[in-house]
A protein has these predicted regions:
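Non-catalytic substrate-recognition and accessory regions of acyl/acetyltransferase enzymes
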Residues: 5-132, 136-140, 144-190
Length: 190
């Protein structure tokens, strides 16, 4: 697991990344710079941004992430919420309108057992790639998580939807057994 001795009281940049943006009046995409950030559990601005997202997205996962953020995660070492955003600086004040997606992770048992991906959620306006301004948001968030937790296995329980489960397979996750909703990403050893 990642061990950081620095205490941070604002969202911090994990990595610069790229998302694909749909060109005007076209289904062609163009790359746009984005940021993958980790929210600070001790920051009132991050709390407010997540609360605003919960209210504007009106999704039960966003609501669960918000309540986990303000209460539950403070008691769990290595529990984090990450955001993919088109905001590229000024992470003290996250602009909820620029957040493309959120991911909540928890430790999976003891240190060294990997992480558990509790929630992954795209902004509602980008759920359908054909209709949204941005696409490949989920893939971008997963790739950034894999880099952040380099060498760790990532576990998740998928919804029982064939297209969602296929999304995880395309991104390197293996279904544990046929009919199971448990998927695991195991990093390749070098």
């Amino acid at each position: 697991m990642i061990n950081s001795s620095n205490v941070n009281f604002k969202a911090s940049l994990v990595s610069k990344t790229t998302v694909l943006k749909r060109a005007e009046n076209s289904f062609k995409t163009i790359p746009q710079e984005a940021s993958f950030i980790k929210l600070s559990l001790n920051n009132s601005y991050d709390n407010k941004a997540l609360k605003d997202i919960k209210q504007s997205w009106q999704h039960p996962f966003a609501e669960s992430m918000y309540f986990d953020f303000v209460d539950y995660l403070k008691h769990i070492e290595e529990g984090n919420i990450f955001a993919l955003t088109t905001q590229n600086k000024g992470f003290k004040n996250i602009d909820p309108e620029k957040v493309l997606g959120l991911v909540e992770v928890l430790p999976n048992g003891k240190t060294g057992q990997g992480i558990f991906l509790d929630y992954i959620l795209k902004a509602p306006k980008n759920i359908q790639a054909k209709m949204g301004d941005f696409c490949k948001i989920g893939e971008t968030m997963l790739n950034n998580l894999k880099n952040f937790y380099k060498g760790e296995k990532i576990l998740l329980f998928s919804l029982s939807d064939d297209s969602i489960q296929e999304f995880y397979r395309r991104n390197g996750f293996k279904q544990q057994e046929i009919g199971s909703n448990l998927f695991i990403f195991r990093p390749t050893s070098k």
